């Protein structure tokens, strides 16, 4: 499977047993569709035939500018993690 695309690399906390998947909790806004698209992209990226990985995800408030910026950064981090897992890093 080809790696997902991302524009930056960031360090991530290690897997935690408390979370089962990375999700974007956005609903009922124009940004909700963006959140859904991000979730679908990550789900597609993570469907490679490898064991499931437990990841911690941030709590995000998409109704603020800072929250939207954090959501985009978290999405890039998740893509980086997905790429690393697909490459076996």
UniProtKB/Swiss-Prot annotation:
Keywords: Cytolysis, Host cell lysis by virus, Host cell outer membrane, Host membrane, Lipoprotein, Membrane, Signal, Viral release from host cell. Residues 1-47 form the signal peptide. It comes from the Viruses. It is found in: Host cell outer membrane. Its main location: host cell. This is Probable spanin, outer lipoprotein subunit. Residues 1-21 are annotated as: Disordered. Disulfide bonds: none annotated. Component of the spanin complex that disrupts the host outer membrane and participates in cell lysis during virus exit. The spanin complex conducts the final step in host lysis by disrupting the outer membrane after holin and endolysin action have permeabilized the inner membrane and degraded the host peptidoglycans. Host outer membrane disruption is possibly due to local fusion between the inner and outer membrane performed by the spanin complex. Interacts (via C-terminus) with the spanin inner membrane subunit (via C-terminus). Part of the spanin complex which spans the entire periplasmic space. The spanin complex is composed of spanin inner membrane subunit and spanin outer membrane subunit. One of its GO terms (biological process) is killing of cells of another organism. Residues 1-10 have a biased composition (Polar residues). One of its GO terms (cellular component) is host cell plasma membrane. It is a lipid-anchor.
């Amino acid at each position: 499977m080809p790696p997902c695309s991302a524009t930056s690399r960031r360090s991530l906390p290690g897997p935690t047993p408390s979370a089962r998947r990375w999700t974007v909790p956005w609903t009922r806004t124009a940004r909700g569709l963006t959140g859904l698209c991000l979730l679908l992209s990550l789900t597609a990226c993570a469907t490679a035939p490898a064991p499931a990985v437990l990841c911690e995800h941030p709590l995000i408030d998409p109704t603020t500018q800072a929250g939207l910026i954090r959501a985009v950064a978290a999405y890039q981090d998740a893509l980086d993690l997905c790429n690393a897992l697909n490459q076996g890093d």
